[in-house]
Amino acid sequence: MRRTLMAICLCLSIAMGWAQTEGRYDKGSVPVVNGRVMLQETIYTTLGQAESYDRISQWAQQRFSKPKVIVSKFTSNDATNHTLSLTAEEYVVFANRFFVLDRTRINYWVEIQCTEQGATIKMTRINYWYEEEREGGLKFSAEEFITDDAAFNKKGKLLKDQGKFRRGTIDLFDNLVEEINNVLTQ
């Protein structure tokens, strides 16, 4: 009886671990605000508003320069309101194996608003250019491809093609948030 109970507990804990691996890509992880996909995160810090803005501005100048991005343009760098916004285009690599490079160009807009409590990062206006080498490739927006309605089948399972774009976009945003968090906690 005791061994059976231990085996059941072990199986349940393993199953729970597997279930949590895809959790950050599940339904609800790509919010749509006013018809646009908008990923948003707030990072809290003990730094002042001006100090946070200065650190993030320096980080952004380095992060959004070549060769890390294809092209970027700062649309607003407002030191008085402590707001930074830019557009960027870079590659998201899905697979990089011998003779196989599966990637897409992602074009997005980022706004970073610094407050006394921390910084809010928003990523929106996301567009993709997939397989650009093949007859011009495919161009589409995040609203057409990675929203809950487009990325999941009727049974609630993440579709293969939409899934890789959804995972790549969420991972890119999470990477930006992690980098900003590291800058603010140094």
Which sequence ranges carry the predicted segments?
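Bacterial Sec-dependent N-terminal signal peptides
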Residues: 1-23
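Ser/Thr-rich, low-complexity intrinsically disordered terminal regions
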Residues: 20-186
